[in-house]
């Protein structure tokens, strides 16, 4: 388990450093499976049902994580789960259309630090591991989500 978390952390660190250093490369270096099937990542996550289950687990972890739980104490968690499911569905190449606020607006008043953001990513990785999502699919999803950090980290 520790090795898996360490590997995931290393992969995320690489993904995030790519986002910081070469954002264009991170966005143009499409995963191999996406070239043949734009919905391959969506399918790897179990489509809408799998993403819904993943977001249920993930949001529950966020709410229970003492490092960041205070950021969610006044949040409608069911609404958050729905919004995140729609967003990840769209990001993964699924048929959903995320219609929530953009990331800058959604996080403007939250005071999210880099440490808060890293805790959130760790919770997402743990939820993906618990659902046995293949490591390569996890990395692809994290690579697609990584550019959002610029709008989420506000302090």
Which residues fall in each region the model found?
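Signal peptide cleavage region of secreted peptide precursors
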Residues: 21-23
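Positively charged n-region of N-terminal signal peptides that target proteins for export
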Residues: 1-4
């Amino acid at each position: 388990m520790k090795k898996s978390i360490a590997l995931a952390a290393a992969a995320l660190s690489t993904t995030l450093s790519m986002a910081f250093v070469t954002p264009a490369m991170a966005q143009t270096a499409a995963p191999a499976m996406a070239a043949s099937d734009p919905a391959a990542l969506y399918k790897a996550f179990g489509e809408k049902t799998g993403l819904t289950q993943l977001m249920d687990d993930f949001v529950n972890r966020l709410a229970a994580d003492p490092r960041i739980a205070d950021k969610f104490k006044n949040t409608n968690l069911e609404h958050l789960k729905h919004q995140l499911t729609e967003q990840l569905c769209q990001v993964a190449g699924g048929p959903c259309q995320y219609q929530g606020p953009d990331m800058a607006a959604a996080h403007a008043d939250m005071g999210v630090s880099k440490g808060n953001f890293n805790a959130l990513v760790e919770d997402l990785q743990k939820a993906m591991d618990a659902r046995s999502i293949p490591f390569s699919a996890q990395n692809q999803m994290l690579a697609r989500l990584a550019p959002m950090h610029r709008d989420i980290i506000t302090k």
